[in-house]
Structure formats: structure tokens, C-alpha cells
């Protein structure tokens, strides 16, 4: 496994692999990898000749109240995990090589103004910008994203379509702990009591899945989910919403494919979860 730290050396390696006719898969990450990331890398390994993992804490997706420096980092552990999973290359650039001020941004506004975009207004602009940069640097045949970040996945798909990237976007299932909590680096911030309280998210997902059906009013589903979360004293709802699976806009009734998503604070830690329903 190789590690590159500049755009130039990454492109040189990719160029050689392309000359050999190799297919390339990319798993974009911000590091501090867990089993959710591992599932993406495994899927990528199954479907491509070359597996590239980006390990880059992207500064442009952090808002003014979000602490970039506090984001957890452990590149040694990340690289060991990637090597065990059969990755061929880790792209680990310095921010100064990725961004030169002033720099351009990529933004998909129509899908970014609901759900997480309401309270994190610059987040998806930063995500789209760094992902488009990685796509241009790595030029992968396929790129892998987790469905836990469902709004992000929808935005990336839209960006690829609108900007004519010749890349297949592969969405991979949410990976959960044995008790149902969705895997996340943020879980490490939870105290023992908060960790137990956080299970209200997966219980709410289960209640929503048990309730939803074609034609039902969105509020009937969302009310049951909110009740479960509101019964937990340590939980504070950011949002619990049902949106169109394609344009991320709110729906009043289940008449097409939908995404049911939530963001909930457990203490000071913001967690997300979701499920999809196909009509």
C-alpha cells in the first residue's frame, strides 16, 4: 500500500494504473476510520482493481461554530486498517495543497437547504467542493459513500449528474452496533449514560419503519418517532423529517420514494440516522 501527500504524486500513480487498464475505486473519508468506513473499503475492493482511500479532514465543510482542530485524527491507525482491508493507496494531502486562497466552490443549493443543511448552511458546499476535487485528482470509475449520510449521498449523485462526471456513485448500507446504534466517530464522544440514551434514535427508526406505508400522512410517521426521542431526557431533537428521496424537499404524504431522517443531540453530541422507503 502506498501513501501520497500531494496532488502531483497522486496523479502520477493514477496515470500509471490507468495506462495498465486498471479500474479504480475511491472511498472518500475524513479519517478516524470505523467499521462503517471498513464496509465501504471492502465493497470497493470487491468491485475494482485499485482501491484508493482519501484521508483528509476537509476544512471547508466546518462551520464557524464547529471546531476543525477538535476533529479526531489517527492516521497511523487509519493506514493500518486500510492496509489490512487491501487498499492500494491512501491519499493524505496537506490542506495547502488542496486549497489555494481564494478558491472556487461547488454548491448544489436545491438539495442543501433542508435537513442538515438548515443548521449547517456551508457544510454541503464544502463537501461538494472537496469531493469534486478528489474526483478530478483520482478520476475513479466508482466512488463509495455510506447511506447514513443520505442527504450527502443525494447531493453527490446530483453533482455527478449535473457536472457530467463519468463516475458510478455506489451507496452502501448503514453499519450499526449490535444494539442498533449507527456507527459514527461521534459515538466516541458519548458518556456511558449518553451511549444508552442514544439508542432512542434506532428505536425511532424502527418505529418509523413499522408505521410507514404507501398513502400514509408523513406526520403520522414522524409523530411516533418524535415521541420516542422526546421520552429520552438526554435527547434534544434538531429535526425529524420526511423528504422526497430525490430532491430532499418535505412531503406531506407517502406517494413516492421518501427518506425519513433525523438529527438528535445526545448531550452535546449531534447524531444522525435515517431510513428509506420505496413506493
What are these regions (language model features)?
Residues 2-234, 243-245, 275:
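Nucleotidyltransferase catalytic core that binds NTPs
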Residues 224-279:
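Phosphate/ribose-recognition catalytic cores of enzymes acting on nucleotide-derived substrates
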Amino acid at each position: 500500500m502506498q501513501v501520497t501527500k500531494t496532488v502531483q504524486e497522486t496523479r502520477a500513480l493514477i496515470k500509471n494504473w490507468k495506462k495498465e487498464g486498471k479500474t479504480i475505486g475511491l472511498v472518500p473519508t475524513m479519517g478516524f476510520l470505523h467499521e462503517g468506513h471498513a464496509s465501504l473499503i471492502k465493497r470497493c475492493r470487491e468491485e475494482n482493481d485499485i482501491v484508493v482511500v482519501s484521508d483528509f479532514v476537509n476544512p471547508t465543510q466546518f462551520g464557524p461554530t464547529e471546531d476543525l482542530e477538535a476533529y479526531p485524527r489517527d492516521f497511523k491507525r487509519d493506514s493500518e486498517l486500510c492496509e489490512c482491508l487491501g487498499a492500494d493507496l491512501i491519499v493524505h494531502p496537506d490542506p495547502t495543497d488542496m486549497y489555494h486562497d481564494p478558491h472556487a466552490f461547488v454548491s448544489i443549493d436545491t438539495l442543501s437547504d433542508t435537513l442538515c443543511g438548515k443548521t449547517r448552511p456551508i457544510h454541503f458546499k464544502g463537501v461538494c467542493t472537496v469531493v469534486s476535487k478528489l474526483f478530478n485528482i483520482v478520476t475513479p470509475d466508482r466512488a463509495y459513500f455510506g447511506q447514513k449520510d443520505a442527504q450527502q449521498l443525494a447531493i453527490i449523485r446530483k453533482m455527478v449528474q449535473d457536472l457530467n462526471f463519468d463516475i458510478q456513485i455506489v451507496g452502501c448500507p448503514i453499519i450499526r452496533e449490535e444494539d442498533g446504534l449507527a456507527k459514527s466517530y461521534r459515538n466516541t464522544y458519548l458518556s456511558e449514560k449518553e451511549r444508552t440514551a442514544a439508542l432512542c434514535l434506532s428505536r425511532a427508526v424502527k418505529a418509523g419503519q413499522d408505521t410507514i406505508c404507501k398513502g400514509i400522512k408523513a406526520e403520522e410517521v414522524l409523530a411516533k418517532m418524535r415521541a420516542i426521542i422526546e421520552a429520552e431526557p438526554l435527547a434534544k431533537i434538531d429535526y425529524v423529517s420526511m423528504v422526497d428521496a430525490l430532491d430532499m424537499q418535505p412531503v406531506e404524504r407517502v406517494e413516492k420514494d421518501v427518506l425519513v431522517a433525523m438529527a438528535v443531540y445526545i448531550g452535546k453530541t449531534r447524531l444522525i440516522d435515517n431510513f428509506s422507503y420505496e413506493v
